[in-house]
Amino acid sequence: MSKHVEQLAVNTIRTLSIDSVEKANSGHPGMPMGAAPMAFCLWTKFMNHNPANPDWVNRDRFVLSAGHGSMLLYSLLHLTGYDLSLEELQNFRQWGSKTPGHPEYGHTPGVEATTGPLGQGVAMAVGMAMAERHLAATYNRDGYNIVDHYTYTICGDGDLMEGVSAEAASLAGHLKLGRMILLYDSNDISLDGDLHHSFSESVEDRFKAYGWHVVRVEDGNNLDEIAKAIEEAKADERPSLIEVKTTIGFGSPNKGGKSVSHGAPLGADEVKLTKEAYEWTYENEFHIPEEVAAYYEQVKQQGAEKEESWNELFAQYKKAYPELASQFELAVHGDLPEGWDAVAPSYEVGKSVATRSSSGEALNAFAKTVPQLFGGSADLASSNKTLIKGEANFSRDDYSGRNVWFGVREFAMGAAMNGMALHGGLKVFGATFFVFSDYLRPAIRLAALMQLPVIYVFTHDSIAVGEDGPTHEPVEQLASLRAMPGLSVIRPADGNESVAAWKLALESKDQPTALVLSRQNLPTLEGAVDRAYDGVSKGAYVLAPANGSADLLLLASGSEVSLAVNAKEALEKEGIHAAVVSMPSWDRFEAQSAEYKEEVLPSDVTARLAIEMGSSLGWAKYVGNQGDVVAIDRFGASAPGERIMEEFGFTVQHVVARAKALLENK
């Protein structure tokens, strides 16, 4: 292909981006204008992908971590033949379009990850690279490299200022993820102005210290130098950072190289001058020259041929390794093996076990029948009970290991989990103390937004943590996560509810699940022995009916359910008929029919007392105007857990007193 056509193809990306932002009167033109050459080079000369099948298993992954530059990605998707029409580019940032302001996974064909919150794209790419290495180590055989793709990312200065990218880059270097290549759009400009006001470190030295291969391209418009750098990166066994020096808003005579081109349309006059600088002789907006369209058609055809070659290889693989191939297909489709849950542990009345421990037993049981179960903890596996026994650690020396040591990198763990789930082929879990869920909350939010079935194991879920004190005792976290759309929060009351929660989490294909688990032992509840799965799946159920017509409902989740049962028994001795409702999952309960809700929370029983060792926020919906809540609306304290619970009123005596007061005030 001639240099002239290459330059024309690059400028087509630029002008499509400019025109789309201009028409929307909203957006970020500067980044696509500066980064177009590196993106063009990557997408047309290196990336293995088939626009006709965006879900090809062994495609190279591309993440635009600098998601504000979304028109760069949309232009490439359209030009290379993905199902994204020119009309969609013209409807950039409009209601109902496939071209939202920031890329959204599942919304636009070819978009691999929802990005925009800076830094997370880098960390998700690390997760994708981890998934690729694990699946390659698990399924590849001599002569059959069915998983051997690269993960490419384009990021900006803002991405590399974010802490999550530092956490993830540290992990990637440690794991020697050589199939991850990060192209850094280094333009020395941030939204507020020149970068030197806030960022002056040597990114090159920092990434070398992480264990990365680093190369610098001085001229971001030099396609040959960019290609040479990518070739070097592919040949290196370490993850690679390619710093490409660019000019934001390249070509704009008055706004190029300035922050003013970052997040606003150029304006009609500047657009005209910019296109003249590109020697763009076409008058129509959104114009694609014929020779450019013809070139991109060749790229599309090459992608189809690459997938066809892979399909032929996989057909041979299926003949040589039928069982392995079947397992691989099941995993990449997100399905579970037949009979996988037959190994589920169960607990009898009389046995006490912390839900973190029953969770660990469930995890280990299901790991035997679900080989794609993969994950770990942010340096708390022994406390979270998330070690898969008998399995190796995932490491630079053994990528087949299923136990991931994320280190004390909660945010990177959450984002990497998203990347693994986006990659496909794995059932992913990650763990930490519940109070530290705040550290990865932005990643949880993206998981919910992308509808990714990742599993969070959050242990040490209340003031019962005890001696570690208020820094480690969650109070507001439960209400906070319940407020997040699309996230299923399950706080099981005993071992059987805990196992049911794991089953539901593993069965999910389109929703993340947070398991909120106790540190302290909890008794096995008689009402949950045979009904835990059905009850947890519906979010709430009558665990212990009243002895006769109910005078009072006791509502609780997690460790407080056994307290409610004990309070019920004390009340019954005084002739007060109370029913106990276990409410492990509000979001699941809200999805039930009105009839079922009435069955669990009969409207004629207005005396309702909720019991939960967390914020009272949200309980009013269930207890009503005549109800009450035993909760915690202050921070905890440092003392033995039993003493703290007593001081905060989580005793049978206090609950009974509150219940009787409630009935007296009716």
Swiss-Prot record:
For this UniProt record, give its keywords in alphabetical order, as a comma-separated list: Calcium, Magnesium, Metal-binding, Thiamine pyrophosphate, Transferase
Please give the InterPro entries that the UniProt record associates with this protein.
THDP-binding, Transketo_C/PFOR_II, Transketolase-like_C_2, Transketolase-like_Pyr-bd, Transketolase_bac-like, Transketolase_BS, Transketolase_CS, Transketolase_fam
> GO biological process: what's one of them?
pentose-phosphate shunt
- List of catalytic residues: 410 (proton donor)
Query: What top-tier enzyme class does this entry carry?
Result: transferase
Tell me the residue numbers annotated for binding thiamine diphosphate: 68, 116-118, 158, 187, 262, 436
Name under which the protein is recorded: Transketolase
Species per Swiss-Prot/TrEMBL record: Halalkalibacterium halodurans (strain ATCC BAA-125 / DSM 18197 / FERM 7344 / JCM 9153 / C-125) (Bacillus halodurans)
